[in-house]
């Protein structure tokens, strides 16, 4: 989920103030926490441009931790804290205050100078200006205290990893969610799983759970193939310390520095793994034909049964969705399935085999164990609301509790993968730190994307939100949950209060009724609260545990419970991510923000205009649903920090701004019908106020760019796509909530489809694909109105009906029109399709449109004039208006 306004990120390194902070994977130079080695070798990361603007704030704490040497028995300090240098922070806050004063003075001036000749438009614009000021303030105040926290991975290793190769790190369950192998290409999902299995985390301490919410045998068989390939891929990653550990992304990189321990074997191993991966992809693609052929063969052998079943490789009927849907075997109506693909490994390293004819890669010095891998397809039956992604993750929560019950959980969408193998360790640093670790419900990592066009035309990276706003929230109660790449504390998801509000740790389960009637699950809750315990070996899948797993996945399990309300991920809202994070914050938990270099996780994003707008529509509609629900941040949550409440009000109410913004964007139509552009007099004073307010906003933005590590293009794209969203989808989101308030259905939200480019030449093919949809037309109208307004203004100026003062006022109005067109420029490129590869064509078309409309306006004015006629002679000449002076 993303919101308007700025964004923020934590991470990176700082060389200022003697803190010696590191960038993600590096240790800090100022010593460590309790029990750390004072003489530990420091590995400094490459300094990024933004790091010089940050200084440490925890030097006294770190010095005290080093001095006691861990003798106090407390956990170490596992992250460093930084704030923006005063040379930037003080001007940033001062500019914010000055702009606020300017907005207040502007509003007072407007109230004292009503425009009698256009009171209707004046009142609308005054209300709009007031709302713009309020929404800006709501967005800005959350960024006045940005904080960066940088994990100390070296100290974590010193404290928890043992010399014999074992580790005392806590257990971690990783959730992956997917639905459709077509709209969500399976190669993405399987790469995500491979990167999780190969992550730099104790093998016996983390497990991976794939939730297939479509119950597709394609995913099941694909996971079997992935488990086989992982036996080669994961040891290869460990032997050569490669990054990233998703093979599709790894092999796409032409070259990178070698960091492994066997350089003499690397080239041959690399070639062999590349061949194996290509064959693996062929096998995955072949499943779409192999499974139907296999099923046809079995169906012919069982023709007397009269059904066209889908068959598994072992000759049993697939209990999930069939290729030819049948009763009890179709989407929305099938049995639950759970299958352990890779068993839980032993807690002792297991070395592989030396190179041989069958396997030319030498793994004799490599631990070849693999983490536990589980396939889940929950039960679905007619008459039950399955609650989409939130419902699937709640089933994962219960099933994993019965099998591994790790105290920490991290969730991914099916198209995201682990880009930095140490990312899991980074999140654990925040969870185990002795300062706020126990009260931290989740650690949010920023979203980063592959295959986005170089100019990021549709602001997919959303850097202003992820690298500024979330960094600001990090200084309050913590960032919001954005749906993927987030590490949770299991008991926090269960609705348990944080320790600061729960002095009695023994009273974790206050009511079994809210969790359901499964005793084994309820008994697992207090066990999960022990965050430093290891994953115990899961029970054997005997009849009793299989029945418990079946009960946990049953549709009726949640009836009469608090699942989807105060337990697990929240239901009945399009943005279950934001409201789930809000539920945790309002009960007193805090969150942390972690940015690493290289990026912790990466994924795919829609680069097609229509798909991107549908994504924004779902986010904005869900935001308003939250605002008008019992989770409204305006009222809910007595434990919510006041500034955090303001941030959530902004994140949920921002689409309302589009109502007034759309009025301003369509206001230039007055050029056409009235020939004036006044909503306030004296007009020059009005424009002067606007220039001051806008200039102050841009100045604030330039300072924000510095401390957040953004680029000017990031800032421009954020402004452009906010205007595009405000014209195309935010009004639909407002309409959606109005309809729902009247008990009607509301607007349907379309899930974003992901596609795999088949060749390098088609890498950005979706960018140039025009998918016409109704939500495109409001922005097209705004473009047309502003082009017509500029053309009409030119026509009126040439016709000679304006005084010099009127032309001066008109020129100020034209600046507004041109500014609108520049902001909507990416949208205009999007609807041009492949013509947008030559952007100059757009400018030529716009200029031609200006000329045509100006000539048309001149002709209309001339024909309406009582003393002047405009007509053409056969010879091709023309009689021009007398006011032109010819």
From Swiss-Prot:
Location within or outside the cell? Golgi apparatus membrane
Listed A to Z, the keywords are: Cell wall biogenesis/degradation, Glycosyltransferase, Golgi apparatus, Membrane, Transferase, Transmembrane, Transmembrane helix
Query: Entry's Pfam families?
Result: Cellulose_synt
Which of this chain's residues are annotated to bind substrate?
413, 415
Q: What residue ranges are annotated as transmembrane?
A: 87-107, 118-138, 659-679, 683-703, 723-743, 775-795, 812-832, 840-860
Tell me the lineage of the source organism.
Eukaryota, Viridiplantae, Streptophyta, Embryophyta, Tracheophyta
The name on file for this protein is Probable mixed-linked glucan synthase 8
Task: Specify whether Ribonucleoprotein is a keyword of the entry.
Answer: no
Q: Per the UniProt entry, what are the Gene Ontology biological process annotations, in alphabetical order?
A: cell wall organization; cellulose biosynthetic process; plant-type primary cell wall biogenesis
**Provenance organism:** Oryza sativa subsp. japonica (Rice)
Record's InterPro entries?
Answer: Cellulose_synth, Nucleotide-diphossugar_trans
Q: List the disulfide bonds.
A: none
What is the membrane topology here? Multi-pass membrane protein
């Amino acid at each position: 989920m993303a919101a308007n306004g700025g964004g923020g990120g934590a991470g990176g390194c700082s060389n200022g103030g003697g803190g010696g902070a590191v960038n993600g994977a590096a240790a800090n130079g100022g010593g460590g926490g309790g029990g750390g080695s004072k003489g530990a070798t420091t590995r400094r990361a490459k300094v990024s441009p933004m790091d010089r603007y940050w200084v440490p704030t925890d030097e006294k704490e770190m010095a005290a931790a080093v001095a006691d040497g861990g003798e106090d028995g407390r956990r170490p300090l596992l992250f460093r804290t930084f704030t923006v240098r005063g040379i930037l922070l003080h001007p940033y806050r001062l500019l914010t205050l000055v702009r606020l004063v300017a907005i207040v003075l502007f509003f007072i001036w407007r109230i004292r100078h009503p425009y009698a000749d256009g009171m209707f438009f004046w009142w609308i614009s005054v209300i709009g200006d007031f709302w713009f000021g309020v929404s800006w303030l709501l967005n800005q105040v959350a960024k006045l205290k940005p904080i960066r926290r940088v994990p100390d991975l070296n100290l974590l290793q010193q404290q928890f990893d043992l010399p014999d190769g074992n580790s005392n790190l806590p257990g971690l369950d990783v959730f992956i969610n997917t639905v459709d192998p077509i709209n969500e290409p399976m190669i993405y999902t399987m790469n995500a799983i491979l990167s999780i299995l190969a992550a730099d985390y104790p093998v016996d301490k983390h497990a991976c759970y794939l939730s297939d919410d479509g119950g597709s045998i394609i995913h099941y068989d694909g996971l079997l193939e992935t488990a086989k390939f992982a036996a080669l891929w994961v040891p290869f990653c460990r032997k050569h310390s490669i990054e990233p550990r998703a093979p599709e992304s790894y092999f796409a990189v032409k070259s990178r520095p070698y960091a492994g321990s066997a350089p003499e074997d690397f080239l041959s191993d690399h070639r062999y793994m590349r061949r194996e991966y290509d064959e693996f992809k062929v096998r995955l693609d072949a499943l779409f034909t192999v499974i139907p052929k296999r099923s046809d063969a079995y169906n012919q052998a069982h023709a007397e049964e009269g059904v066209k079943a889908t068959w598994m490789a072992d000759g049993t009927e697939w209990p999930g969705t069939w290729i030819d849907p049948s009763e009890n075997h179709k989407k929305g109506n099938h049995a639950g399935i759970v299958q352990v693909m890779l068993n839980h490994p032993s807690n002792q390293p297991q070395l592989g085999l030396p190179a041989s004819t069958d396997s030319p890669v030498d793994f004799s010095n490599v631990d070849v164990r693999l983490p536990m891998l589980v396939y889940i397809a929950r039960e679905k039956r007619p008459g039950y609301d399955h609650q989409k992604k939130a419902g699937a993750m709640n089933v994962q929560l219960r099933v994993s509790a019965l099998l591994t019950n790790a105290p920490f959980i991290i969730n991914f969408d099916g198209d995201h993968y682990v880009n930095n193998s140490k990312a899991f360790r980074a999140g654990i640093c925040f969870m185990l730190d002795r300062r706020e670790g126990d009260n931290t419900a989740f650690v949010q990592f920023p979203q980063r994307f592959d295959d986005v066009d170089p100019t990021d035309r549709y602001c997919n990276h959303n850097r202003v939100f992820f690298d500024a706003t979330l960094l600001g929230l990090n200084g309050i109660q913590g960032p919001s949950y954005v749906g993927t790449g987030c590490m949770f504390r299991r008991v926090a998801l269960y609705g348990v209060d944080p320790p600061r509000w729960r002095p009695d740790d023994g009273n974790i389960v206050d009511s079994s009724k809210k969790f359901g009637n499964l005793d084994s699950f309820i008994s697992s809750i207090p066990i999960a609260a022990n965050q430093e315990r290891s994953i115990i070996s899961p029970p054997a899948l005997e009849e009793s545990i299989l029945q418990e797993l079946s009960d946990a996945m049953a549709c009726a399990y949640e009836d009469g419970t608090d699942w989807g309300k105060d337990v697990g991920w929240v239901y009945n809202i399009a943005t279950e991510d934001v409201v789930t994070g809000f539920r945790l914050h309002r009960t007193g938990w805090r969150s942390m923000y972690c940015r690493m270099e290289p990026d912790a996780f990466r994924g795919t994003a829609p680069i097609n205009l229509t798909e991107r707008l549908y994504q924004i529509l779902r986010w904005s509609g869900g935001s308003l649903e939250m605002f008008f629900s019992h989770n409204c941040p305006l009222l809910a949550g007595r434990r919510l920090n006041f500034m955090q409440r303001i941030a959530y009000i902004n994140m949920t109410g921002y689409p309302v701004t589009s109502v007034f913004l759309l009025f301003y964007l369509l206001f230039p139509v007055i050029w056409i019908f009235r020939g004036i552009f006044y909503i306030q007099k004296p007009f020059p004073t009005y424009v002067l106020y606007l220039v001051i307010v806008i200039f102050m906003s841009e100045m604030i933005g330039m300072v924000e760019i510095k401390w957040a590590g953004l680029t000017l293009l990031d800032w421009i794209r954020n402004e452009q796509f906010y205007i595009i969203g405000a014209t195309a989808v935010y009004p639909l989101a407002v309409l959606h909530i109005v309809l729902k308030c009247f008990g009607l259905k509301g607007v349907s939200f379309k899930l974003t489809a992901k596609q795999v480019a088949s060749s390098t030449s088609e890498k950005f093919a979706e960018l140039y694909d025009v998918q016409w949809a109704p939500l495109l037309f409001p922005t097209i109208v705004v473009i047309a109105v502003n082009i017509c307004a500029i053309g009409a203004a030119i026509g009126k100026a040439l016709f000679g009906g304006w005084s010099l003062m009127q032309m001066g006022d008109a020129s100020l109005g034209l600046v507004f029109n041109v500014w609108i067109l520049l902001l909507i420029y990416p949208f205009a490129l999007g609807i041009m399709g492949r013509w947008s590869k030559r952007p100059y064509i757009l400018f030529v078309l716009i200029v031609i449109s200006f000329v045509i409309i100006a000539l048309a306006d001149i002709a209309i004015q001339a024909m309406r004039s009582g003393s002047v006629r405009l007509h053409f002679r056969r010879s091709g000449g023309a009689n021009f208006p007398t006011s032109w002076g010819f």
